[in-house]
């Protein structure tokens, strides 16, 4: 949600205020959150800044909880990601995962992603941006990035998206099967 709000801010900086955000947020559809226009680095940087705003954070928290507890009709559940999902938004979630990868792997992945968008960016710029973001995310006062004790740590450094998905699915399936017995 923060990326789409950042997109709105960068597109209409003069209109950007809490009333504007409330109006825009009501119109967001799930498919909007996967739009490629939300992937550029400048959107991520702005999203990080916006997510420190307590009033916007309350709006987004409420929406995330709504999607988690009352997913759209055609869905029987939900999967949310974010720095504070496991301890603030959904502390009672059935399954919690904390995905990580080493810095160079994350930088390579992000660099490839940005290159696909035809962004003129250097690998070292991406690497430094991620270093800064990590520093900011772990040390921030409002909703820092942290792993909860009950979250399962998955290092994705050597995993493809598909292999990561399968690993998570297997953990969930095994747990559900165990609980049925």
Roles of regions detected by a PLM:
Residues 167-178:
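C-terminal alpha-helix
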Residues 91-112, 120-132:
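Conserved phosphate-donor/acceptor-positioning beta-strand/loop module used by diverse small-molecule
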Residues 94, 147-162:
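Phosphate-binding beta-loop-alpha motif at adenosine-nucleotide cofactor sites
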Residues 14, 113, 117:
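Basic phosphate/pyrophosphate-binding loop/patch that engages nucleotide-derived ligands
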Residues 49, 98, 152-153:
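Short aromatic/hydrophobic contact patches that present stacked aromatics
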Residues 85-91:
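SF2 helicase motor core recognition
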Residues 2-78, 84, 104, 108, ...:
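ATP-dependent small-molecule kinase phosphotransfer cores
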């Amino acid at each position: 949600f923060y990326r789409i709000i950042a997109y709105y801010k960068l597109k209409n900086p003069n209109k950007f205020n809490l009333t504007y955000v409330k109006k825009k947020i009501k119109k967001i559809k799930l498919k909007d959150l996967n739009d490629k226009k939300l992937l550029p680095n400048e959107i991520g940087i702005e999203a990080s800044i916006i997510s420190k705003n307590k009033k916007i954070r309350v709006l987004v928290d409420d929406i995330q909880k709504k999607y988690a507890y009352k997913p759209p009709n055609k869905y029987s559940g939900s999967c949310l990601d974010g720095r504070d999902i496991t301890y603030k938004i959904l502390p009672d979630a059935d399954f919690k995962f904390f995905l990580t990868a080493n810095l160079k792997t994350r930088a390579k992945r992000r660099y490839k992603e940005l290159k696909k968008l035809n962004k003129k960016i250097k690998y070292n710029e991406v690497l430094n941006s991620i270093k800064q973001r990590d520093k900011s995310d772990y040390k921030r006062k409002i909703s820092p990035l942290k792993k909860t004790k009950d979250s399962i740590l998955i290092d994705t450094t050597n995993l493809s998206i598909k292999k990561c998905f399968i690993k998570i699915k297997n953990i969930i399936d095994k747990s559900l099967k165990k609980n049925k017995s």
